[in-house]
Amino acid sequence: MEQLTGVLDKIRVIKYDPLMIRFTLTTIHKSYCCIVAKKELATKILMLEDGKYNVVVNGHYNSRNQVVVSLFKVRNSDHITKLIGF
């Protein structure tokens, strides 16, 4: 399981049924393409603003070299992330 820390950016919906989203995690060294298939987690991430939040992501790589996110935490919480439940 890979743990990455960086800035959440370019959040997009891939599929609506079942809900699947992608986002770019920009670290100091590299940008990672991440996907989320868990509906509850994807719904919460869609409410976040691009380029504003520093996050920690745990997951594994799929065959397309994308990080499949299993755990997601916001490091710089504010009132919006607290309302959402991060």
Question: Which residues does each predicted region cover?
Answer:
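A short, sequence-level motif marking secondary-structure junctions
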Residues: 36-42, 73-76
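Beta-strand elements of well-folded, non-transmembrane domains
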Residues: 10-12, 29, 61-63
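Residue-level recognition of well-ordered beta-strand positions that form the cores
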Residues: 7, 24-26, 58-60
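OB-fold/S1-family single-stranded nucleic acid-binding modules
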Residues: 60-86
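OB-fold (S1/OB) nucleic-acid-binding surfaces
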Residues: 16-38
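Short nucleic-acid-contacting surface segments enriched for D/E, G, S/T with interspersed K/R
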Residues: 40-57
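A generic structural signal for short beta-strands and their flanking turns/coil linkers
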Residues: 2-4, 21, 30-32, 51-55
